[in-house]
Amino acid sequence: PIAGSMVLAAILLKLGGYGIIRMMQILPTTKTDLFLPFMVLALWGAILANLTCLQQTDLKSLIAYSSISHMGLVVAAIIIQTPWGLSGAMALMIAHGFTSSALFCLANTTYERTHTRILILTRGLHNILPMATTWWLLTNLMNIATPPTMNFTSELLIMSALFNWCPTTIIMLGLSMLITASYSLHMFLSTQMGSALTNNQTEPTHSREHLLITLHIIPLVMVSLKPELII
């Protein structure tokens, strides 16, 4: 069920990060050097999840692994225990909550018309559903964290906090973000570009679907314009 996937990616997955933030506040203050193994594990987990995204052929699985990779960055930022790290983690959880939920919604829109989630079989939708292609482009750009979205602000805060703590982490962060851009563009090009494989009659997108995506995009744009609301 797509509603379950949207709630899972947008809310339940982020509750773990929120729980870690609350736990870190009640734990006694310790040197961040003790958290180095967890930091490396979180960043390495983010890279592995990103690499898993690259080899996915199932659209829904790709978006799910994308959510997991972003949570690796969130955990790494929380562990540092700096104001920038916590602000970046909170902002990324909120921003990616909207983004991943919108991506799942778009994946369902595609599935309802093609009856498959295989990337190669869903291509050529830009000729059939041009407005849905626009939504795909916007959400993928937000997933990549292009400015001036909230995703960009949050990842910039996380990168700054991690680089200030240990400059070597920029290698893992840079690799993670490069792979994120690769699979996001791959997902967009695979589902939208090319020629459609089926000649079946496809019904146009409904107003309810546009409304659903708009209700994801508008709060994200508002938070991007006024980040003081959450940072």
From Swiss-Prot:
Main location (coarse class): mitochondrion
Catalytic activity field: a ubiquinone + NADH + 5 H(+)(in) = a ubiquinol + NAD(+) + 4 H(+)(out)
Keywords: Electron transport, Membrane, Mitochondrion, NAD, Respiratory chain, Translocase, Transmembrane, Transmembrane helix, Transport, Ubiquinone
Topology with respect to the bilayer: Multi-pass membrane protein
GO cellular component terms given for this protein: mitochondrial membrane
Cellular location(s): Mitochondrion membrane
Stretches that traverse the bilayer: 1-21, 34-54, 63-85, 89-111, 118-138, 156-176
An example Gene Ontology biological process: electron transport coupled proton transport
InterPro entries: NADH_UbQ_OxRdtase, ND/Mrp_TM
EC number(s) from the headed UniProt entry: 7.1.1.2
Any one Gene Ontology molecular-function term assigned to this protein's record: ubiquinone binding
Family, similarity comment: Belongs to the complex I subunit 4 family.
Function: Core subunit of the mitochondrial membrane respiratory chain NADH dehydrogenase (Complex I) that is believed to belong to the minimal assembly required for catalysis. Complex I functions in the transfer of electrons from NADH to the respiratory chain. The immediate electron acceptor for the enzyme is believed to be ubiquinone.
The protein's name: NADH-ubiquinone oxidoreductase chain 4
